[in-house]
Amino acid sequence: MRQIALGKTGIVTPQNAFGALPVQRCDDDTAVNILRKAYEGGMTFFDTARAYSDSEKKIGLALSDVRKEIFIATKTGAKDKEEMKRHLETSLENLKTDYVDIYQFHLAPRCFAPGDGSGMYELMEDFKRQGMVRNIGITCHKIGVAEECVESGLYATMQFPFSYLSGEREKKLVAMCKERDMGFIAMKALAGGLISNFKAAYAFIEQFDNVLPIWGIQREEELMQWLSCMEDTPAKNEELAGIIEADRRELD
């Protein structure tokens, strides 16, 4: 499997990452088992959020002893600076670490920037100076906000929905990130469950050498599907191209 460099973050990881939102639905033992097997199977990038109830705690339980071998991205949906300070403090405690590799504004309604009056971006920079945050990222669902964030040059990573059901504007966003050496993290690479063929989903993503997909995983059988891609990486062929085109016709 391809190793990708996530923009200018210094993060190099297999193009196959763990989305930890669903493990909040698992009991501790199940979650720890799945997370540990993901790491042992070769996954090194784990994405979570303060909003995902106990997801961060489960990552801390499962992976704190291999912290230096993995990359952790988490998120804050804080509405003000004081709340963001509390969020980061709680996240670090839950994750059993003193830093996160990427700290992301969660579902940002706008492009936070220095001097915008909120003080939010300046606080992120302060976290970074203190060594608690290594890279500043942002996640959003609105393409216009995403484009503004990329064009601003303020962020190390962009997390945005991206799958083979995405349109040309989303593909252009990926290209913009590549041009600016900005990491692109693909959420919802299964289009919120509309895509059922994991090989077709992966084969589409594999065409983009700057895109890191995060797969939401809560069952071991799901994990084993994605780990199978480590050894036998799906590439777009006639069969998978047919599945992709059929889904596009049906679901567009």
Give the residues covered by each predicted segment:
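Short glycine-enriched loops at secondary-structure junctions
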Residues: P22-Q24, A51-D54, A78, C140-G144, ...
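Short hydrophobic/aromatic-enriched beta-strand-loop microsegments
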Residues: E69-I72, Y155-S163, T233-L240
